[in-house]
Regions:
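N-terminal glycine-rich phosphate/pyrophosphate-binding loops that anchor nucleotide-derived ligands
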Residues: 1-34, 110, 248
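Glycine-rich anion-binding loops of enzyme active sites
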Residues: 6, 39-125
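Short, acidic Gly/Pro/Ser/Thr-rich loop/turn segments
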Residues: 7-10, 96, 118-121, 167, ...
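Short pre-catalytic strand/loop immediately N-terminal to key active-site residues, enriched for Gly-Thr
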Residues: 16-20, 135-142, 158, 194-195
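Small-aliphatic-rich amphipathic alpha-helix that forms the alpha element of a beta-alpha
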Residues: 18-42, 59-70, 147, 151, ...
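Glycine-/charge-enriched secondary-structure boundary and capping motifs
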Residues: 51-74, 81-85, 92, 154-254
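Internal active-site segments that recognize and position negatively charged phosphoryl groups
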Residues: 106-115, 142-166
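Short, compositionally biased
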Residues: 121-138
C-alpha cells in the first residue's frame, strides 16, 4: 500500500488537461508499488476542488477511467470536498514474488537504474516554454515500471522508484541499509546534465543486486551505475573527481 498527494502548482500545472491531471496523479502513486516489486490491484481517490465547470469533472473522470483500464485496476472508493485543487490517491497491490524493501542493500552490491533520467525534467521545461516535444508526455503521463519491477524481483536486494531524484532516492536506500554508495557519472543514463540526477519525476527504478549477477542483469537492459560501499554517504565521480550538488532532490516543503 502507498499514498500520494498531488497539488496544483506543486505537482501539476493549472494549464494541464483534466485527463492528464488524473492520469499523472494516479500513475505517480502507482509507481511506489513498482518500487516495492509489486503490481497494482485497486485504488481510492480523494479529490479537493473549487472548480465550478462540470465539463472539467467529466474530463477528469475520463482520465481516471483511462488509467484504470490501462493498468487493469479497480476504483473502490473515494471522497470529494471543496477547496484548492488537490488529489490524494491510495494504491494497493501485491508483490510479484516478495516485497523489495529499501533496507536490503548489502556491502559490495551493484547499483542499477532501469532507464534514462531527465526526460520528465526536459518535458516540463518544454511545456512551460510552450514547446511541443517528445518529452512532454514523460511529464504529463509518467509510466510506472511494472514489467521491469517483475524482472528485477528475481535478484534485487533493495529497490526504490526515482520520484524525488536519483541522488535523494538512492540516499534513502543507503540510509535504511546503513551503507554508502559510489556512482560513476559516465555510466548513468541521463538526457542532459547532472541536474537530471536531482530533479526527480523520472519514475524509473533504482535497485541493488549481488555483483556476481552484473552481466546477466546488464543483458536484460538495466544500467550498472555504481556499487554499495561501507563508507556512509553517496559519492558521484566524474573523470575521477567528486561532483557536488546544490540540492539532493525534490523537497515538498521548499
Amino acid at each position: 500500500h502507498s499514498v500520494d498527494i498531488s497539488r496544483i502548482g506543486v505537482h501539476f500545472h493549472e494549464s494541464m488537461r483534466p485527463e492528464d491531471i488524473a492520469y499523472r496523479s494516479i500513475t505517480t502513486a502507482l509507481s511506489d508499488l513498482a518500487g516495492m516489486g509489486s503490481f497494482p490491484s485497486f485504488i481510492s481517490i480523494a479529490l479537493t476542488s473549487d472548480i465550478e465547470e462540470i465539463s472539467w469533472y467529466e474530463k477528469f473522470s475520463k482520465g481516471i477511467k483511462e488509467t484504470l483500464d490501462e493498468f487493469s485496476i479497480d476504483l473502490v472508493g473515494g471522497d470529494v470536498t471543496k477547496g484548492e485543487l488537490n488529489i490524494s490517491v491510495n494504491v494497493f497491490g501485491y508483490p510479484f514474488k516478495k516485497p523489495i524493501l529499501r533496507n536490503g542493500a548489502n556491502l559490495g552490491d551493484s547499483i542499477f537504474v532501469t532507464g534514462q533520467l531527465g526526460k520528465a525534467k526536459q518535458g516540463l521545461n518544454d511545456l512551460l516554454n510552450k514547446k511541443d516535444s517528445i518529452y512532454c508526455k514523460d511529464f504529463l503521463r509518467p509510466k510506472p515500471q511494472f514489467q521491469k519491477a517483475k524482472e528485477l524481483s528475481d535478484f534485487a536486494t533493495s529497490c526504490i522508484d526515482i520520484s524525488d531524484g536519483l541522488i535523494k532516492d538512492l540516499g534513502d536506500i543507503c540510509k535504511q541499509s546503513n551503507v554508502g554508495a559510489e556512482l560513476c557519472y559516465e555510466d548513468i543514463p541521463i538526457l542532459n546534465d547532472h541536474k537530471d540526477l536531482t530533479h526527480g519525476d523520472d519514475y524509473e527504478l533504482c535497485f541493488t543486486a549481488p555483483s556476481h549477477l552484473d552481466d546477466q542483469i546488464k543483458s536484460q537492459g538495466f544500467f550498472l551505475i555504481g556499487k554499495i560501499i561501507q563508507k556512509l554517504g553517496l559519492l558521484v565521480k566524474k573523470d575521477g573527481c567528486e561532483i557536488t550538488f546544490e540540492k539532493n532532490g525534490w523537497d515538498p516543503f521548499e
